Amino acid sequence: MRNPVISSQSSLLSRFAALCLFSSFVIPHSSFAVKPLLLPEVLASVQNQYPPYLAALIEQDIANGRARQALGAFDLNLNAGGSFNPAGYYDGQTGYATLEQPLPFWGGNVYGGYRMSSGFLPNYNKDRTGVDGEAILGFRIPLLRDGTIDRRRASLFQARLDQKLADPFILRQHLDFIRAATIGYYGWLAAGQRLGLSEELLRIAKDRDSAIAEQVKRGASAPIVQVDNKRLVVSRQIAVVQALRRFQATAIELSLFHRSSADDQPIVSERGRLPGAFPAHPEPDANQIVADIAKAAIFRPELRRIELTIEKLRIDQRLAKNNLLPNIDIGVQANQGNGSKDIEPTEIEAKIEFKMPLQRREAKGRLETAEAQIERLENDRKFARDRIAADVRDAYSAMIAAHDQLKQTQLNVDLSRQLERAESERLKQGATDLLALQIREQATFDAKVLHVEAQAEYFRAQGNYRAATAADAPASLLR
């Protein structure tokens, strides 16, 4: 059988441990001063330590790698080879080594090298050289197709546009992460203030409990009044636990954005870092809306991304039109022999080649695709301008409404406090009962909570407005 004394002590110890754990969250430590956590510190952490943003920055490195890869089409090429006749009337051997350089203009290339033959080869064999071999120098130039543009240059041009496209992608991520961090920060601040209000409401009920107990002892109040106040204390303790959980959840969410500069680990901000109040909330300037819409149209990444994508498609369009043309290539090659005089020491050869697919379906299909995609993106660009203007107007409207709500909730707090003080005086005079005062206290608490939420909503709306106007865009990502 379990010892009731030990059981009672264990229960007391467990309650004491739970109370200590609860107090560590509810009661801020005052043994040392802690610097309040302000929004700029969180935003700086996002730009320097937030992993998704750091991952977005790598997009520029990826684009740089693709541009370098496209440049590889213009690398200097070393070609070498040889041949021999293991059987037959002729037993000659030939070998060659050349360097070929593609040109970055007009689709041509130049080449030069050396070749040599030995053994017995017929005079008509073009691979036959003198004893000491011969030097080779030549070039090839397209006259129509692949002149103004070819696949190599198209890939390079598009890779360079991809480098520029990385900036709108990074900027979009930057604006989204800054907005999310801002909303998370003010959600954390609002939850902390709501927790403080819940604790204040609990303290009022606890302070009144001893006074009611004294009144019951003197016979001035019925015992049921004390029971009712104890019930009120318990219900308000439950509200504190709920508010504490909400604060912990917002602190954990904020820690994803707020990280240690030493090891990049998330920082779960304690109550001691809560600022004393929300920042000032000035009324939005109605004269700025037109200028901000124009600014957003310039700096928002959506339009820039569409414009650069259209440029890439125009390169595809040019390439498709190029592929409709026939191949007419000309080339000149000069050979300078050394040594034996039995063959002509200097030889110059000119070539011309014509080639064209008769149906040209591949080029026509590519052209149709590029033109259709350009037309689609032109419509997207027009709508993007409208969407940006609508985003700015909607965010501004939300900010105006939040500011108006702030004024109304502050008035609501003032009136609720006035009614609560009047009801408290009436209770002292015996003109009302405890229930009426509890209702007034709850109304004041609800009014204060509404005011806290209104302040958080104002700064959330402000964060959305700044994102809509690209106000927090880094200069390095703007064109």
Predicted segments, located by residue:
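Intrinsic disorder/low-complexity segments
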Residues: 1-33
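Bacterial Sec-pathway N-terminal export signals of envelope proteins
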Residues: 32-94, 139-154, 158-160, 168, ...
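Small/polar, glycine/serine/threonine/aspartate-rich low-complexity segments that form flexible
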Residues: 34, 81-141, 273-286, 317-318, ...
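Periplasmic alpha-helical coiled-coil/stalk elements that build and connect Gram-negative outer-membrane
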Residues: 167-292, 398, 402, 425, ...
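C-terminal structured "cap/appendage" subdomains that terminate the fold
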Residues: 419-453, 459
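Gram-negative outer-membrane assembly/targeting C-terminal domains
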Residues: 457-479
